[in-house]
Amino acid sequence: MQTLKVDLGERSYPIYIGEGLLDQPELLAPHIAGRQIAIVSNETVAPLYLERLSKALGAYSVLPVILPDGEAHKNWETLQLIFDGLLTARHDRRTTVVALGGGVIGDMAGFAAACYQRGVDFIQVPTTLLSQVDSSVGGKTGINHPLGKNMVGAFYQPNAVLIDTTTLNTLPERELSAGLAEVIKYGLICDKPFLGWLEDNIKALRALEPAALTEAIQRSCAAKAAVVGADERESGVRATLNLGHTFGHAIETHMGYGVWLHGEAVAAGTVMALEMSMRLGWIDQSERDRAIRLLQDAGLPVVPPQEMTPAHFMEHMAVDKKVIDGRLRLVLLRQMGEAVVTDDYPKEILQATLSADYRAIVAQL
């Protein structure tokens, strides 16, 4: 087992990474204050892991709260089901909410914990690669709004993150690839040597080889923890973690939540960010193409939806958390391994990026 730390002073917390951690309640015990636990999961993950985790936490009074699965349910109506469960079971301020699932479950359970009785303890037990390397770390919680993704939420840090890498053995291939989009992101924004490692190990990762998965998760979480420790509330460097996300969120919103997985939309959005970085003269074509090939090798889409026009993108990107005083800030690459957040770019470069023929770009690789 490996243990990392998210350093936030008195609110610091550990990230445990290893095999079989669901069966080690002693890891979670120091982070549970009361006797009540609510395990929030979904209809897909609960049949696989709820009984196992509940048994490990048998010393506590465990309430299961099972939600419908998918991004389409990341909304007010589903959030209310968590509150309904907590109130019906008369959970008090010393309850601990445990998120058992992927990014949607983690975001909603965390938001519920932030709101319930003005804040109760919260533990992340992520079961997808995307949630293990990204969304479970850093305290971003929330739900979607019909007009924009993740527009209603709170920064609310967990007490601990427990990553049992064996849960990836039941992850569908498409979901695994979606998680690899976030892993690749870390190489692009802050760890160029990691890109080379990923190129050498992408087949091993897709084959679920334990050593490769553990290495990728550890390096990704270490990068995320360092950024969150330096900028918890995304006033500066943390925004670089959103490479590809502004374009990607536009895709998710336009296509309908859940039609494209988050990681798939981020992958296509990353290609657009690479294209814009190249058009600004910050990276060259060979570097753009190298990153696109890696995304392809991960089994990810690298072309935005054909039905989305530049006007569609502009409409959705106008409702983005990175819009400040009416100006859209974008995360781009100053060079491979170094990201920048900027609103200082010619509008014609953005328009050219939105209008680019990505099918032709990919065809020439």
Curated annotation (Swiss-Prot):
Residues reported to bind NAD(+) = 69-74, 103-107, 127-128, 140, 149, 167-170
Give any Pfam family that matches.
Answer: DHQ_synthase
Cellular localisation: Cytoplasm
Cofactor, how bound (note): Binds 1 divalent metal cation per subunit. Can use either Co(2+) or Zn(2+).
Chief place of localization:
cytoplasm
Q: Which pathway does the UniProt entry assign to this protein?
A: Metabolic intermediate biosynthesis; chorismate biosynthesis; chorismate from D-erythrose 4-phosphate and phosphoenolpyruvate: step 2/7
Which domain of life does the protein's organism represent? Answer: Bacteria
Family as reported in the entry's similarity comment: Belongs to the sugar phosphate cyclases superfamily. Dehydroquinate synthase family.
Q: Name the NCBIfam families for this protein.
A: aroB
The entry's protein name is: 3-dehydroquinate synthase
- What is the gene name? aroB
